[in-house]
Structure formats: C-alpha cells, structure tokens
C-alpha cells in the first residue's frame, strides 16, 4: 500500500506480514491434536481423556501466558519473545516423536507448546496493530487473527495425511520444521516500534501524532508485575468481566470443542479422518474471510453489535451439529462448516477494539487477560468433551 513517502510500501505492512507468517507457523500445532489423537490412541492405547488433558494444559497455558507475554514484549522486545516462542513450539513438536509414556505428552504437547504458542498468541497481533497502525487497526487485527486460521488451512490436510500414510511422527516433525523456518524471518524483519525504522505508524498525521512513551526496560519480574497490575486494574470494571465471560464461551465453542474433538467425533460416525480434517480446513478458509471482514466492520460499526450477532449465529450452529454428523458429507454439513467458519474467530477484532477503547494504554495487557479467559473456556471444553466421550461413549452431550 502507498505510504506517506509515496508509492513505497510502509514498513508497518512488512512487519504485519512477518507477524502473519509467525502466527501461521505457530498455528501448525493448532491443527495437530484432532488429527493425531486417533493414531496416538491406536499406538499407545491412551484414552481420549488423557490426550484431552494434554491439550487442555496447552490451551490453559496458551491463554495464561498471553498477558505476561505482552508485558515481556514491552520489556525485552517483540522480536526476542517471538523467536524464543517459535523455538519452544519446535522443541515441543519435534520432541514428541520420542514419546513412550502419556506423561511425556503432557510435557511436549502441554507445557512446551503451550508456553510457546501462548507467548505469541493474539496479544502479539494486538501489539503489532496498536503500535504500528493508527488507521486500519481493525483490519490489521482481523488479518493477523486470520494467520492462525490460515495455518490451520495449510497444515491440517498434510498433518492428517502424513499421520495416516507415514505415521504421526512425521506429522509432528512437519509442525516443528515450520516453526523453525519462521525464526530467521522474524529476526530479520521484526522491530518493536515504527521509530526503529525511522517512520510514524501507518496513517499517523505528522502534525498531530504524539508517540506514546515506551515502557522502561527491566527484568522478567517487573514485566510479570505489570501484567498482574493490568489484571487488578481491569477486574474493577464490569466491562472486563462481560468481555472475559463472552470470550470464554468463544474459546469453549471453537478451540476447545470443535478444534479438538470434531475429527474424533466425525470418526465415531464413520467419517474418514482425512475427510473430517478437510472439513476443518474449509472452516479455516471461511475463517480467513470472516475474520478479515470482521476487522473491516470493526472499523465502521459498534463492536458490541457485531459480538451479539456472532455469538447468536454460533449458538444456533452448535444446537444442530449433532444431527449433521454422518459417515458422508451432506449439504447441511457444508452449510454448517461455511457459517461456523465465517464466525470462528470473528469475535477477536471487536473484542480487541473494545479493550483498547475501554482500557486505553492498558488495553493490550487487558486483552491478554480476556484472551486467557478464552483459553480457560477452551481447556474446560476440551477436557470435558473428552471425559464425556470416555464415560458415555458418545460426543452428543458434549
């Protein structure tokens, strides 16, 4: 896009593009659990609830690390935090090929990948959008949020195919390789602030723009204290609790329930794993469209109205899903996949915008805590659905 300097691309867009690549690479694991649970269960005899526990630990850390990661990015730099995070994802995914016991699954899938993905979750996207853009913030937030969906779209079919043809270990190595490839790209291009590139944020008016003060560099302890202070500050506002509860429901109904258990549930109904993985990939396609469109709408419409609409559509979709699962894909399932895909994380841009609008300079860290609620909801749904499946023999009541 043209910038204030003529027809050259503003550096903000290059930074956003690299952030998209990093989020895409980290999203490789988001595609993995649903596709790998069946082969892991067949090889090791692990129950669905045990594997769901590992995913739940991952999802909890993915959320709880986020507000601290936002503070760490302020203290130590975005590039440093993201490079370490991608390395942890690679170690967790690559190390999992050596597993022989279920407790090791908790370490690799749960601890390492949970910390890695949590350190560059949606607070990373919010940090880039808020620091590098004055105009188009909502659109950029939508585009970066879509990075995870694009990762799911790209990784899910090959992960499922590799797990079925070459074995789950090769699928895990694919995820590890993708994370490692992104590290040098992030290190070469990513910078903390527009002033590091000698420019203003995209869309800033040179006559009126005043750069916000940079947080003082400090220790990890001071960064953690800043994250806790953000929670204490936000918890005194009813708006925070409304956003957190709504986002917890969002996490439960996406990452926790559908993201983890859709493929095993479809497999229970006789559908091939690769077919179910293909359907989730289609969710990823429409998620990209829905999230980018949601970002554009967030710049133009009251975010509160958007959230009411998004949650309403999602509730209707979940009510009808148990009657749509079968051994083949019917037109009604395609309709569900399209609608659910458009709605998947369309909630993120308006939620981030409301955090920025209500909490000002603390908005990014507060959004980190709201996102933590999202992942707590996801973890509860992932574990709960696994327990229901093991206890009742069906996902219907999940």
Model regions and ranges:
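Cytoplasmic helix-loop-helix junction between adjacent transmembrane helices
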Residues: 109-147, 360
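Helix-loop-helix hairpin linking two adjacent transmembrane segments in secondary transporters
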Residues: 144-197
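Interfacial helix-cap and linker-helix signal at transmembrane-aqueous boundaries
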Residues: 40-41, 72-73, 154-166, 266-267, ...
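Helix-to-loop junctions at the C-terminal end of transmembrane segments
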Residues: 65-78, 291-303, 389-390
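Hydrophobic core of transmembrane alpha-helices in multi-pass small-molecule transporters
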Residues: 24, 92, 104-120, 248-249, ...
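Extracytoplasmic gate region of multi-pass secondary transporters
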Residues: 33-38, 232-294, 348, 381
């Amino acid at each position: 896009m043209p910038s204030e300097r003529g027809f050259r691309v503003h550096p903000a867009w290059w930074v956003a593009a690299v952030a998209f690549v990093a989020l895409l690479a980290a999203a490789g694991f988001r595609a993995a659990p649903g596709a790998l649970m069946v082969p892991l269960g067949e090889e090791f005899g692990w129950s669905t609830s045990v594997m769901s526990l590992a995913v739940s630990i991952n999802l909890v850390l993915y959320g709880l690390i986020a507000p601290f990661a936002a503070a760490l990015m302020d203290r130590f730099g975005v590039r440093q935090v993201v490079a370490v995070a991608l390395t942890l994802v690679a170690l967790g995914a690559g190390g999992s090929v050596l597993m022989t016991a279920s407790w090791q699954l908790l370490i690799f899938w749960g601890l390492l990948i949970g910390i890695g993905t949590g350190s560059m979750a949606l607070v990373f996207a919010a940090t880039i959008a808020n620091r590098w853009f004055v105009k188009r913030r909502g659109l950029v937030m939508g585009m970066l949020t879509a990075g995870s969906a694009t990762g799911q779209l790209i990784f899910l079919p090959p992960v499922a195919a590799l797990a079925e043809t070459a074995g789950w270990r090769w699928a895990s190595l694919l995820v590890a390789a993708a994370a490692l490839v992104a590290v040098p790209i992030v290190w070469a291009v990513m910078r903390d602030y527009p002033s590091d590139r000698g420019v203003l944020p995209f869309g800033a008016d040179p006559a009126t723009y005043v750069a916000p003060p940079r947080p003082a560099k400090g220790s990890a302890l001071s960064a953690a204290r800043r994250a806790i202070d953000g929670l204490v500050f936000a918890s005194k506002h009813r708006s925070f609790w409304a956003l957190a509860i709504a986002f917890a429901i969002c996490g439960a109904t996406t990452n926790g329930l559908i993201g983890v258990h859709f493929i095993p549930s479809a497999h229970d109904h006789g559908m091939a794993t690769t077919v179910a993985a293909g359907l989730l990939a289609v969710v990823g396609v429409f998620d990209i469209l829905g999230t980018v469109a949601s970002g554009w709408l967030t710049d133009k419409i009251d975010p509160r109205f958007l959230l009411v609409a998004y949650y309403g559509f999602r509730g209707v979709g979940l009510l009808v899903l148990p009657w749509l699962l079968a051994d083949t894909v019917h037109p009604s399932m395609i309709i569900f996949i399209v609608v659910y895909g458009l709605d998947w994380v369309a909630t993120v841009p308006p939620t981030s915008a409301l955090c920025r609008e209500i909490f000002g300079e603390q908005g990014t860290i507060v959004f980190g805590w709201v996102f933590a609620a999202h992942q707590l909801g996801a973890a509860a749904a992932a574990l709960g659905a696994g327990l229901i499946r093991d206890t009742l023999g069906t996902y219907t009541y999940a």
